[in-house]
Amino acid sequence: MAEICYEVVTDACPSSVYESTPAHSRRRPRFQTVMHEDWEKNCKRSKQEALATRYSSIPRSSREDFSDQNVDVSSPRYGVSSVCGRRREMEDAVAIHPSFSSPKNSEFPQHYFGVYDGHGCSHVAARCRERLHKLVQEELSSDMEDEEEWKTTMERSFTRMDKEVVSWGDSVVTANCKCDLQTPACDSVGSTAVVSVITPDKIVVANCGDSRAVLCRNGKPVPLSTDHKPDRPDELDRIEGAGGRVIYWDCPRVLGVLAMSRAIGDNYLKPYVSCEPEVTITDRRDDDCLILASDGLWDVVSNETACSVARMCLRGGGRRQDNEDPAISDKACTEASVLLTKLALARNSSDNVSVVVIDLRR
C-alpha cells in the first residue's frame, strides 16, 4: 500500500527558490509517498495462495474447460489509499483479504475489505486490522444464505473483537505511545469499523462508528451504512436509556467526550458506546463500485461526489481483460482512491483519510 504522509517543512529544510520572502518562509505542506513493502508482499502472497487453493479445489477433469465457463470467480479489482493528512499521527488502518473464505458448499470464495478509524491511539485500529477478518472467518457457517445468519455472524465477530481489545490493551503500551500518559492505559482508545464481505451475489456490510460504505449503482450513490452519531434519534434514546448523556462540545458527544455512539474499544464509555454493528445485505446487480472510507473523506466529500469520481476513474480504466493477472491491484481503482484522498485534503479535511474502492462490474 502506498501511504501519502503529510509533513511540514521547517526552516531547516532546504527550499528551491524565494527562501527569504515572507510567504515562502512560512511553514508549508509537502507530500511524501512511502511504499509499505510488507503490505504489498502480504497482499500479493495472500492473493496468490488464495488463487492456488481455489484452482486446486477444482476437479482435474474440469480444469481445462475452466476458462470457457461464464462464471467469473476472480478476485474483484480494488484500490487503496491511506493518508495521514493534517494529523500528527496516523491512526487509520485498512484490511484487504481477497478470497479470505470459501464456503464448503461452494467453490466461489468470499472477499473481505475493512477500514478502521482509530481514536485516542492506533492500537485498536491496528488490532482490528490483524484480527477482525479472522474472527469473521471463524464465525462463518457453511450456509450463509439467510440474512439473519449474516447479522449474527457479524455481531458475534464484533463482540469478540471488542472483548479482545479490552483484555489486550494493557499489554501494548510502549515507551513511545501516548497511552503511557493514561490511567488505566488504553481505556480511552477505540476505533470505528466498516467492513464488507463480497460474495458472487451479495454485498454484506457491517458498520460500527462513523466510517461509511457507499455503493455506486448505475452512477448513483446507495449508502450501505448509517453513521453512528450521538444525536441520531435512535442512538440518543439508547444512550439516555442506559443512563448516559449526550453533551454538545463543538459537536454532539457521548458524555461530552466521544463524537460517535458506537465503536470497538472505549472501555471507559461503556455501556453508552456500543460495539454492536449495523448489518446490511444487498443483492448484487448493475453495480459500479463500492467505496469504504473513514470520516476524513465523508466529512468533506458527499456520497454523490465520491461516486462520480470513482465512476469516472473506472470508466477510464476499462474492464478487466481475459489475460490480465487478477492478483494485481487495479490501476483504475487505485487512481480513484488516490483522487478521493487528494480531494479530501484539498477541501481541508483535518483527519486521517483512508479510502478503499472495489470494482463490482461483472
From Swiss-Prot:
<feature type="binding site">
    <location>
        <position position="118"/>
    </location>
    <ligand>
        <name>Mn(2+) 1</name>
    </ligand>
</feature>
<keyword id="KW-0479">Metal-binding</keyword>
<protein>
    <recommendedName>
        <fullName>Probable protein phosphatase 2C 24</fullName>
        <ecNumber>3.1.3.16</ecNumber>
    </recommendedName>
</protein>
<dbReference type="InterPro" id="IPR000222">
    <property type="entry name" value="PP2C_BS"/>
</dbReference>
<dbReference type="InterPro" id="IPR036457">
    <property type="entry name" value="PPM-type-like_dom_sf"/>
</dbReference>
<feature type="binding site">
    <location>
        <position position="117"/>
    </location>
    <ligand>
        <name>Mn(2+) 1</name>
    </ligand>
</feature>
<dbReference type="InterPro" id="IPR015655">
    <property type="entry name" value="PP2C"/>
</dbReference>
<keyword id="KW-0378">Hydrolase</keyword>
<dbReference type="GO" id="GO:0046872">
    <property type="term" value="F:metal ion binding"/>
</dbReference>
<dbReference type="GO" id="GO:0004722">
    <property type="term" value="F:protein serine/threonine phosphatase activity"/>
</dbReference>
<feature type="binding site">
    <location>
        <position position="295"/>
    </location>
    <ligand>
        <name>Mn(2+) 2</name>
    </ligand>
</feature>
<keyword id="KW-0904">Protein phosphatase</keyword>
<keyword id="KW-0464">Manganese</keyword>
<comment type="similarity">
    <text>Belongs to the PP2C family.</text>
</comment>
<feature type="binding site">
    <location>
        <position position="351"/>
    </location>
    <ligand>
        <name>Mn(2+) 2</name>
    </ligand>
</feature>
<keyword id="KW-0460">Magnesium</keyword>
<dbReference type="InterPro" id="IPR001932">
    <property type="entry name" value="PPM-type_phosphatase-like_dom"/>
</dbReference>
<feature type="binding site">
    <location>
        <position position="117"/>
    </location>
    <ligand>
        <name>Mn(2+) 2</name>
    </ligand>
</feature>
<dbReference type="Pfam" id="PF00481">
    <property type="entry name" value="PP2C"/>
</dbReference>
<feature type="domain" description="PPM-type phosphatase">
    <location>
        <begin position="77"/>
        <end position="360"/>
    </location>
</feature>
